[in-house]
């Protein structure tokens, strides 16, 4: 791994060291970068980032990471996929320095489904239930844990939804890649599936309905179906939980009614194709996207590394380029490879398929490169931890 921009490599991952934050009660920023060949963890104190010297799970692709800061002690979760042993979910209670894999698979399909787990696409700590974690998988399914991610149970009503027989895989497989919970109501859950679209429950998962009105499916004979959209990612607004942002396979949308109706907000972007979207952690109406040229040309729009930000819920967009390469850039950002932390000003982060990781400590106004020459970056998560 190559590091730059005021970043220093950390000590060997097997050594347990006391951080400055632990020693004097300070907080630090934690950055987890899941790649095609392991999980890289960076820690920031006093403006300096230090990456642990070697990756965790270096023989596995890490498709999903969660940093659960709800309890007295943060817990990290990672969805790894070993070419030999298959997929698994690991957890760490010491900020990623050591990891535990349950004796029995945390996520598995019941025998009567006839399905087998291919990978865990999403790990999501519930907003209103302290011990609940959701997992989204491939084949597309939703799982619920009530022990902070050590064991999960299949949410059968979604698995058995009447439309399931008509779901088809997207280019990256048939994955449930987005889970959003509502801090106002633990029974309200929104998920997104590629390629099936957005589905919602208002009764804790007992029943589900498609929520794709206004979202296009340009590749289907009917471009406005009830379900079947290739939704790439959905994020929830910080100030208004009913406002959502959606990056589609062609099209960027917002909803002001929790997904009942969607409005196209792509005007002002150089392309409406892309994978990633993220919401500002505190500021309402503020979200980020990373435009890609086209579905047949999956490189940054105009070959320039540009994050676009809206501060008015999609009425206008501004490019954020300070510190980012603007010539001959080909690093595509995947759906879970952009995120924000919960700092103020907010940290914004993304990694790309060139193995580069960039970070902003000022809401996206300026950027610096944290790492280069990593394996293909699949997911990025960050948080302020004690």
Regions found by a protein language model. Give the residues of each.
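Extracellular glycan-interacting surfaces
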Residues: 2-386
């Amino acid at each position: 791994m190559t590091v730059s921009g005021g970043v220093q490599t950390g000590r060997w991952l097997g050594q347990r060291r006391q951080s400055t934050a632990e020693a004097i009660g300070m907080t630090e920023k934690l950055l987890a970068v899941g790649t095609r060949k392991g999980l890289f963890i960076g820690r920031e104190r006093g403006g300096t980032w230090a990456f642990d010297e070697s990756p965790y799970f270096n023989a596995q692709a890490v498709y999903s990471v969660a940093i659960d800061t709800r309890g007295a002690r943060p817990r990290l979760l990672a969805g790894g996929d070993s070419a030999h042993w298959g997929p698994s979910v690991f957890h760490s209670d010491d900020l990623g320095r050591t990891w535990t894999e349950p004796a029995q698979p945390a996520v598995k399909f019941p025998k009567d489904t006839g399905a087998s787990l291919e990978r865990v696409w999403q790990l999501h700590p519930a907003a209103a239930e302290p011990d609940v974690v959701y997992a989204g998988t491939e084949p597309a399914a939703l799982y619920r844990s009530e022990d902070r991610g050590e064991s999960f149970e299949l949410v059968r009503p979604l698995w058995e939804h009447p439309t399931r027989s008509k779901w088809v895989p997207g280019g990256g497989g048939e994955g449930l890649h987005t889970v959003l919970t509502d801090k106002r109501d633990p029974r309200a859950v929104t998920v997104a599936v590629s390629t099936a679209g957005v589905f919602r429950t208002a009764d804790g998962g007992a029943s589900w309905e498609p929520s794709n009105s206004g979202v296009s499916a340009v590749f289907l004979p009917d471009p406005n179906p009830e379900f079947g959209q290739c939704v790439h990612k959905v994020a929830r607004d910080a100030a208004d939980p009913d406002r959502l942002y959606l990056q589609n396979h062609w099209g960027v949308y917002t909803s002001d009614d929790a997904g009942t109706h969607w409005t196209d907000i792509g005007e002002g972007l150089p392309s409406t194709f892309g994978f990633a979207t993220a919401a500002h952690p505190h500021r309402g109406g503020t979200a980020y996207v990373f435009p890609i040229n086209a579905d047949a040309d999956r490189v940054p729009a105009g070959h320039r590394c540009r994050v676009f930000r809206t501060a008015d819920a999609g009425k206008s967009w501004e490019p954020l380029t300070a510190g980012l390469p603007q010539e001959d850039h080909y690093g595509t950002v995947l759906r879970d490879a952009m995120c924000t932390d919960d700092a103020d000003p907010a940290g914004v982060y993304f990694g790309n398929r060139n193995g580069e990781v960039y970070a902003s400590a000022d809401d996206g106004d300026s950027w610096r490169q944290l790492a280069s020459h990593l394996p293909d970056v699949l997911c990025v998560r960050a948080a302020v931890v004690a």
